[in-house]
């Protein structure tokens, strides 16, 4: 047997009743009390500046973190192509695609 390239990916937001608008399972800065970047305070969701701050705090080189974020945004068409080949219902595919696009847009802001 071979595992699929995305065997560990699961968009839990499609399955969590009442949490449909939650973009992440965990807060990036949970142990930081009331810490929030200006971007998060203004928008209510994480964007590139938040992930860059998180990367800095855990010791990821800035250039590497920026490259990974760009790779993630650039991979959206491949994600959508893989999604179309999935066995999700058409409704599930549409919800998943919207989720991918919303998250990519947040990273692009």
Residue ranges and their predicted role:
Residues 1-109:
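Anionic ligand-binding catalytic core segments
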């Amino acid at each position: 047997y071979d595992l699929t390239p995305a065997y560990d990916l699961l968009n839990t937001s499609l399955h969590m009743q009442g949490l449909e608008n939650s973009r992440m399972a965990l807060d990036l800065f949970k142990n930081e009390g009331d810490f929030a970047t200006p971007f998060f305070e203004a928008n209510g969701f994480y964007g590139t500046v938040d992930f860059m701050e998180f990367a800095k705090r855990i010791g990821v080189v800035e250039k590497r973190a920026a490259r990974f974020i760009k790779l993630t945004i650039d991979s959206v068409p491949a994600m959508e192509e893989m999604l179309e080949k999935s066995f999700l219902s058409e409704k599930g595919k549409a919800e998943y695609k919207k989720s991918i696009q919303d998250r990519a847009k947040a990273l692009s802001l």
